[in-house]
Design a protein with these regions (language model features):
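Phosphate/NTP-binding elements of NTP-utilizing enzymes
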Residues: 1-174
Length: 174
C-alpha cells in the first residue's frame, strides 16, 4: 500500500465474520471489493495453523497470482506477530506455509481436481462466483471437509446464476 505497513484493526463486520467462521462449519460470504475479507481469512487461517496442531488448510483462488497473494498475506501477518508468538521454524514458498506443529496453509489456483485427495481442516474458496465449473469443483471439494472440516466460500457478485449463487440462495433460505 502507499502508506506502507498498515496495522490490522478490524471493523465490526469483520469481527462478525470471524465469529461466524467459529460458530458455523460452512460459511458463505457475499462481499464487495476492498473490504479486507481476504486479509481476515488469511489471519484466521494463520491463527488456526499456529494454535492447533496438524491443521491442513487449503485456499483455492481463481488464478495463481491470487493464490500467491494469499500466502503473502499469511507471511506478512506471521512476520508482524511478536517473536514469542511465532513457532520457531516455518517454511514459506509462493504456494505454501508449513509450520513445525504439522499445520500447513496451501494456496492454489482452481482446477477440477483441486484438493480432491486431501482431508481438510479448513477450505477457503476465494472469488467463487468467478470459478469456471464451480459446481463440479465444489462437489469434489465437499468430500474433503466431510469429516468435520470447515469451509469459507467468498466472492463478489457475478450475476444470478451458477453454483456460488445457488449456494448463496440456499444459505439465505435458512
Amino acid at each position: 500500500p502507499i502508506r506502507g505497513k498498515i496495522k490490522l484493526e478490524t471493523y465490526n463486520f469483520q469481527d462478525d465474520c470471524v465469529k461466524a467462521f467459529e460458530d458455523h462449519r460452512l460459511n458463505i460470504v457475499l462481499k464487495s471489493r476492498q473490504l479486507g475479507l481476504s486479509t481476515i481469512c488469511a489471519a484466521y487461517a494463520l491463527w488456526m495453523a499456529l494454535f492447533f496442531k496438524n491443521k491442513n488448510i487449503l485456499v483455492i483462488a481463481t488464478k495463481f497470482a491470487t493464490a500467491q497473494n494469499f500466502t503473502k498475506k499469511v507471511k506478512y501477518a506471521l512476520e508482524s506477530l511478536p517473536k514469542w508468538l511465532i513457532l520457531p521454524n516455518f517454511e514459506y514458498n509462493q504456494k505454501e506455509v508449513r509450520f513445525d506443529n504439522g499445520s500447513k496453509i496451501t494456496a492454489i489456483p482452481t482446477s477440477e481436481d483441486a484438493g480432491r485427495s486431501e482431508a481438510l481442516s479448513l477450505l477457503i474458496v476465494d472469488e467463487a462466483a468467478f470459478i469456471k465449473n464451480f459446481e463440479e469443483i465444489w462437489t469434489g471439494l465437499n468430500s474433503t471437509i466431510s469429516r468435520g472440516g470447515r469451509a469459507i466460500v467468498l466472492s463478489t457478485p457475478n450475476g444470478a446464476e451458477g453454483q456460488y449463487y445457488h449456494l448463496w440462495q440456499q444459505a439465505e433460505a435458512k
